Amino acid sequence: MSPLWWGFLLSCLGCKILPGAQGQFPRVCMTVDSLVNKECCPRLGAESANVCGSQQGRGQCTEVRADTRPWSGPYILRNQDDRELWPRKFFHRTCKCTGNFAGYNCGDCKFGWTGPNCERKKPPVIRQNIHSLSPQEREQFLGALDLAKKRVHPDYVITTQHWLGLLGPNGTQPQFANCSVYDFFVWLHYYSVRDTLLGPGRPYRAIDFSHQGPAFVTWHRYHLLCLERDLQRLIGNESFALPYWNFATGRNECDVCTDQLFGAARPDDPTLISRNSRFSSWETVCDSLDDYNHLVTLCNGTYEGLLRRNQMGRNSMKLPTLKDIRDCLSLQKFDNPPFFQNSTFSFRNALEGFDKADGTLDSQVMSLHNLVHSFLNGTNALPHSAANDPIFVVLHSFTDAIFDEWMKRFNPPADAWPQELAPIGHNRMYNMVPFFPPVTNEELFLTSDQLGYSYAIDLPVSVEETPGWPTTLLVVMGTLVALVGLFVLLAFLQYRRLRKGYTPLMETHLSSKRYTEEA
C-alpha cells in the first residue's frame, strides 16, 4: 500500500484531518448549519448581531455573484465540477465589504490600506532581488518560510472530499483539515489545477483555473499577496516583502540553489536537497494526483515524501535571457484569441512560456516561466506539486514583476481582458478559484502600487524604445551616406546650371514667356 493510502487513515504532521467542509474556506464557516444554509457571513467581534462588521458599516451579508458568461477551451462539461460558478456550489451568501474593508468577515483592510478604519494608504512594501538582501533580511525571509511550514493557518482550512461528499457519509460531519500556512499555499495551487473527478479512475483533465489563459497573471499575483500577508502576520512585520529571483541569467545553473538560500544538491543523491539546508527536511503535499483520482478524493495535506529537484541530464538547458524579457515586454496585446496556450503575439502567453518570448508559437519550445519550472525539474516540474518548492515563491515574484512592468508601460484598459470566451475561470469577471471571499480577475488587473507593493527592479526596455549600439551605428551611417549623396547631387546640378550659361546663342531656344507670368 502506498504512503498516500496510509495517509488517508492517519493524521499528518502539517495538516490534521477534522470533521469539516470541502473547499478552501474560513474555519468558522465549517459547520453543518453554514454548509446546509450555504451562508458564510461570520460576525466581527463578540457581538452576534455584528455580521460582516455591519454595525460599523464595514460590510453586509449578500448574494454571491458568479460569472455566467460563456467560456471556451477544452472543458466542455457542465455542472460536473465544484469550481464552476465559484463558490456557489458551497455558499450562496458571503460578506460583501464596503470601501477599503476586506476579509471573510470584513475585519481586514484591502491590500495597500491600513488603520482602524482602513482609511490610511499604507507605504508600499518593496520586493527586492533576493541576491540584494542583507544577511538579516535573507534570514528573516527564509526563517518566515520555515515557520510557515510548521505553523497551522489561523483562519483557513482545506477540503478533504469533493463537493458531493461535502457533509461526510452521514450528512453531519463536514470534511476539512487544518493545515500549515505554507502547505495551505501549496494546496491552493493544487486545487486550481486538479482534474475534475467523475468517478474512480475517471478524471477529466482538460481544466485549469490558474494556467493556460489570461488568469495566469492575476491568479498567481493574488496567490503571492495572500502568502505575503500571512508571513507578515506570522513574524509581526507589516513591512516584510517577498523577494524575487531574477532568473533571466541565460546560464545553465541555478544561482539560488545554494545552502545559503534554497539548498544545494545532496552529494549522495543530487535529486534531494543538501542536509546543510533547512529545506532538506521539507516534505511535499498534494503530489499524488493519480491516487486522488483513483480514490475520487482530494489532497488532504498528508506528507508524501521529500522535496526534490533534478537538473541531472539537463546541462544543455539554459535559463531565459534578458533579451527574452525585452522581447516579451515589447508585445503590446495583453492576450489574443483563443486566450489559451496556442494564442500568438500575446504578452500573457509569452510570459507564461507557451509562446516564444517574441510571441511566435512553437510547440517544441518553452520560454520564460514554463522554461524555469522545467529547468528546476523534480517537484517543480508539475503544476499540482510545484508550489511545494519554496523557489516557486521567488520565481513567481519575478514573473509578477514582468507583468507589473508591462502594466505600467502599456496602461491597458479593462476591456483588454476578454469578458467572455476565455477558458473556464479566465473570463474577466470570473471569481478566481479557490480564493474566498470571492475576488475577480479584474480586481487584480492593476499596477502593483495600487495593491500596496512595488519592485526594486530595472527591467530592459524594448528595442523600439532604446536602440542598441548596432542599431544606432546603422542609423548614423545611413544619415551620413544620405548627406554625401545629397551633396553630390547638388554639386552636379550646379555644374549643369553653369554649363547652361555658356551655351552658344545658335543653340538657344527662346521663349516668349515672361517671368511674371504663371508657369
From Swiss-Prot:
Catalytic activity annotation: L-dopachrome = 5,6-dihydroxyindole-2-carboxylate
Cytoplasmic side: 494-519
Encoding gene (name): DCT
Naturally occurring in which organism (per UniProt): Homo sapiens (Human)
Residues carrying a glycan: 170, 178, 237, 300, 342, 377
Annotated residues for binding of Zn(2+) A: 189, 211, 220
Induction: Induced by blue light (415nm).
UniProt topological domain (Lumenal, melanosome) ranges: 24-472
Enzyme class: isomerase
Any one GO CC term of the record: melanosome membrane
Protein name: L-dopachrome tautomerase
GO molecular function, one term: dopachrome isomerase activity
Family in the record: Belongs to the tyrosinase family.
Cofactor note: Binds 2 Zn(2+) ions per subunit.
Annotated disease: Albinism, oculocutaneous, 8: A form of oculocutaneous albinism, a disorder of pigmentation characterized by reduced biosynthesis of melanin in the skin, hair and eyes. OCA8 is an autosomal recessive form characterized by mild hair and skin hypopigmentation, associated with ocular features including nystagmus, reduced visual acuity, iris transillumination, and hypopigmentation of the retina.
Subcellular location: Melanosome membrane; Melanosome
Pathway assignment: Pigment biosynthesis; melanin biosynthesis
Coiled coil: none
